[in-house]
Amino acid sequence: MSVLTPLLLRSLTGSARRLMVPRAQVHSKPAREQLGVLDITIGLTSCFVCCLLPAGWVLSHLESYKKRE
């Protein structure tokens, strides 16, 4: 590393420190109804079926996609 690198980095981060970043005022309420085990199971299963199953099928058949016949 060069001798000037710390000076350059300090000058770049110095201007960023002066910027005002607005903070979000986020407040949450408790859930209206608690989710049961069945609801969570159905949600995770549907995510698996919709997202991971097609991706797994494509990855398992990748060799057949590479062949040009």
UniProtKB/Swiss-Prot annotation:
It is found in: Mitochondrion inner membrane. Keywords: Membrane, Mitochondrion, Mitochondrion inner membrane, Transit peptide, Transmembrane, Transmembrane helix, Ubl conjugation. CDD domains: Cyt_c_Oxidase_VIII (cd00930). Pathway: Energy metabolism; oxidative phosphorylation. Residues 61-69 are mitochondrial intermembrane. It is a single-pass membrane protein. Residues 26-36 are mitochondrial matrix. A motif (SIFI-degron) lies at residues 2-19. In response to mitochondrial stress, the precursor protein is ubiquitinated by the SIFI complex in the cytoplasm before mitochondrial import, leading to its degradation. Within the SIFI complex, UBR4 initiates ubiquitin chain that are further elongated or branched by KCMF1. The chain crosses the membrane at residues 37-60. It holds the Pfam family COX8. One of its GO terms (cellular component) is mitochondrion. Residues 1-25 form a transit peptide. Component of the cytochrome c oxidase (complex IV, CIV), a multisubunit enzyme composed of 14 subunits. The complex is composed of a catalytic core of 3 subunits MT-CO1, MT-CO2 and MT-CO3, encoded in the mitochondrial DNA, and 11 supernumerary subunits COX4I, COX5A, COX5B, COX6A, COX6B, COX6C, COX7A, COX7B, COX7C, COX8 and NDUFA4, which are encoded in the nuclear genome. Belongs to the cytochrome c oxidase VIII family. Component of the cytochrome c oxidase, the last enzyme in the mitochondrial electron transport chain which drives oxidative phosphorylation. The respiratory chain contains 3 multisubunit complexes succinate dehydrogenase (complex II, CII), ubiquinol-cytochrome c oxidoreductase (cytochrome b-c1 complex, complex III, CIII) and cytochrome c oxidase (complex IV, CIV), that cooperate to transfer electrons derived from NADH and succinate to molecular oxygen, creating an electrochemical gradient over the inner membrane that drives transmembrane transport and the ATP synthase. This is Cytochrome c oxidase subunit 8A, mitochondrial. It comes from Mus musculus. The lineage of its organism: Eukaryota, Metazoa, Chordata, Craniata, Vertebrata.
